[in-house]
Amino acid sequence: MAGNHAGPDLLFGFPTIFFGTLAVAGSLGFFFNMKWGRLPKIGEKYYDVIVLTLGLWCLVGLLIDSFAHISGTVDDTFFTPWHAIWYSGATAYGAYIFYVLLPEEGISHMIRNPFESLKGIEPQHKPGVYGIIIFGISGVGDMIWHETLGVESSLDILLSPTHIGLFIGLIMSVSAPVWSAWADPSSGIKGLKSQMLLVFGIGAAWSVILLMFRFANLWIAPIESFCYSSQLNLCKNDRYEDALSIGLQSLYIQAGITSAMLIIFLQRWEPARGSMFLILTFNTVSLFVYTEFDRNVIYMGLVWAILVELALPIYHKLGAKIYIPFIVSTQLIVLIASWYIRASDIANATYWIEGNDLHVLPFGWTIHSTIGSVVICAVIGWLASIIGFPNHQPEMNLK
């Protein structure tokens, strides 16, 4: 059931923001069209810049809308101000893609042969085009879903079928410059400036994926959901095995996601100074929003990003199969260190013994699991790097 709809002020905000931002975008488009003679088509100079800018517009809308859902400040309608930002960006993105696909024969020819233009797109440019199409279809479905079945809250936003379509479409859209540059042998070889589009594309895609898996992220989860203490009421888990299981499940998932996102970048490009820091900064900013602006996340994220950036010589000397495990393990080490500094909020003692087991702060896990969890995260990163960077197979001559 749809429930109660928003009041006049909330509804008024949607058209004002939606059409206002589109008017600004249209004015900028007209300006650059006059300056350049025409806006760039697929594969031309500045095409990837425009696509990424429009994708980031959508991402900002997603972050704002996600915060509204997470904090419970949504109303039971589709037409909210935060949706206006998200969908105005998608409309602008879609309008630009429509322009670049428009054949010389005009709109009538495109209507009669809607798939002809899509067939001619080179493979490296398809994610951006197909992504906004998926996003648009899912957006219409999302409006119908909200107006008939109501608005999701909390973790429900991650499982709404229309939201899943929006997530997939947005990941493809914001990562479009990455796939466009993948086929260009000269991309990303002239320092940080040449890798900015790649960094922003991967970082933005990672932001969406973090939202999809926010239920399994110890940087987001309250510590009482995965800590253990037989002497305190803070921790929700009465059984140690339950606390450890919840924590490990989240660690495994995030270690895999972190490894995968970094492998995409490192498989193709040699990271310039500053690129790894910026990619992880995207991660940090997203988590900051998803935790409802927990400043501790900012501190942890910046420390992690600095450590990874300073460790770049490890990559140059020892390769990705050592560097990626280092990144994944330090992600957990920073979390443990941060909570250990705040250990006074959890218990007066830094350790205690139950039976034959030594339990230590900050999570109350045994010393075996506390140290072993860091090791297993490194192992996950190592296994992922083996898959991402396999040894060259010898040519098989069966004659």
Regions found by a protein language model. Name each.
Residues 1-12, 41, 63-84, 144-162, ...:
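Membrane-interface interhelical loops and short amphipathic "cap" helices
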Residues 26-32, 57-69:
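Alpha-helical transmembrane segments of multi-pass membrane proteins
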Residues 50-61, 126-143, 166-175, 195-218, ...:
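Alpha-helical transmembrane segments of multi-pass integral membrane proteins
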Residues 77, 114-130, 141-200:
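Membrane-interface helix-loop-helix junctions at boundaries between adjacent transmembrane segments
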